[in-house]
Amino acid sequence: MTMKKYRTCESVCKGHPDKLCDIISDSILDACLRKDKSSRVACEVMATKGRIIVAGEITCSKKIDIKRVVRNVLTDVGYNPRKFLVFVHVHQQSKDIAGGVDRAMESREGDTSWYSMLGAGDQGTVYGYA
């Protein structure tokens, strides 16, 4: 007897907390890259009733007004930004991670191939829709 397999998915609207957080983090990344194409952004966003929390590591040569980015997104998706407290807990990328991103271990050990010159802070393959 063959076992049935089911695939499921979830679709949410732009005001849903998961979608809202994705849009905010994407907008923060876009803002950083507009000002500095070499920006490094590892940004997490959490939304709950009346609160948005942005945390992570951002290295950008220009100042980004993260609270303004968050409030613009809230307005764009139909929320009143004045009804939210926005907390930002962001710092620059750690030197340990920057060292791995700036120059791969293989490169530091003498490998001169082009792909060994590329560094990475962390690696993963993900897919999804925001």
Model regions: which residues?
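A domain-level signal for the structural core that forms small-molecule/cofactor-binding pockets
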Residues: M1-A130
